[in-house]
Amino acid sequence: MDKSEMDKINGTNPESTDQAPSLASRPDEFEEEESLVTPDALSARIGGFQIYAGSVNWGVFGSMKIVFLKSKLNVLIPCGFLAIFLNYMTQRYGWVFPLSMLGIIPLAERLGFATDWQISCEVGRLLNSAFGNATELIISIHALSRGKLHVVQQCLLGSILSNLLLVLGSAFFSGGLACGKTMQTFSKADAVVNSGLLLMAVMGLLIPAALHYTHSEAQFGKSELALSRFSSCIMLVAYASYLYFQLSNNRRRNEANVYPCMPLIKRRIQDDVDGNDDEVPEISKREAISWIAIFIAWISMLSYYLVDAIDGASKAWNIPVAFISVVLLPVVGNSAGHANAVMFAVKDKLDISLGVAIGSSIQISMFGIPFCVVMGWMMGKPMDLNFHLFETASLLTTVLVVAFLLQDGTSNCVKGLMLFLCYLIVAASFYVHADPNSKASEKPPQN
């Protein structure tokens, strides 16, 4: 019996003898390649092809369960209903105001959750840009419609100060403690661009204030308002250009990384293969849009009672309206962002923390404030960029401190503590600040 016949009896193929050792010599690679192409292996690796459909609760009750039961902050939702009840039954604004604040906090967090789904990277970033500070804008628009122009200015100013000092300081301090590093690093180039945008916003607010306090207006009472409206349009164009630049930059990076902006199911499979632990959206696109509309309407309703109770709460608590507007109101919109910034800093993802804190400040200063000026223009309200001397000085010093601390691209506990202490100084200054413009800001409409 010759050798070929013996090979047939033993079940071996003489032609495959050259390939067999190569496969046997690297069994791990062979198994890995097989797992990438075999449906059963791929199914076992990501939990089956039904992971996407199973992770998205398409039913109404499943969506409600996710939205209302997955956040511990939702225990505060009944506070909103209690605030409405007290407003109509007792009109005790000292209680209506804090209950309205507590009722809005979980709604703001859930609004952020509803905008978290992403069909593509660009859509996700645009949604976050549009709704990242929706709560502050809704409160500001309600105050604007009531003619409380200085409350609008101070609320938006307080949001910027809170993000730059309190949120960023907490992120730096917590990240330095948790990571056990002498220094944490972040993108110096992004920090420089962000600092430049913040300084541009300060310039937009500083010049109208200087025009007012130097009494150098060509037409008293009109030049300041006209300059504010013109500058607001310029700032909106600058912010739109910044968004376009950011999205274009990210698109180029995504193309270089091959797959980060692929459709969700493909990205989920690839990320699972690469070991990334990205979460699949828990609600569908249609459900997310519906919840966004519901939460905006709900926040808008509670904001009506919140704004209406500011003066009453100021008298009941014997604290200045400026302190309520600058320190307390920003807590409503910044609470969820504050927690996220600290969480990412603890995980040593400081660039994301800066995106939350400084990105929110840029959006308020370059979009929120100019948007309110334009909205006031449309409503016939003389909303301008003259935030008055004390408020503008507070913003200028804050931006300068933050810009200096960011210029080297590193952070530590000491920097975080410095920012936090600076916020305490600012908060105390508004507590003792007797606002001479609170009544002057209720100006008659001008055309």
Curated annotation (Swiss-Prot):
Gene Ontology MF term list: calcium:proton antiporter activity
Membrane disposition:
Multi-pass membrane protein
Q: What is its main location?
A: membrane
InterPro entries on file:
CaH_exchang, CAX-like, NaCa_Exmemb, NCX_ion-bd_dom_sf
Write out the transmembrane intervals.
Answer: 66-86, 94-114, 123-143, 160-180, 191-211, 225-245, 287-307, 319-339, 354-374, 385-405, 414-434
Q: Which GO terms describe its cellular component?
A: plant-type vacuole membrane
Whose protein is this, by species? Answer: Oryza sativa subsp. japonica (Rice)
Q: What does this protein do?
A: Vacuolar cation/proton exchanger (CAX). Translocates Ca(2+) and other metal ions into vacuoles using the proton gradient formed by H(+)-ATPase and H(+)-pyrophosphatase.
What is this protein identified as? Putative vacuolar cation/proton exchanger 4
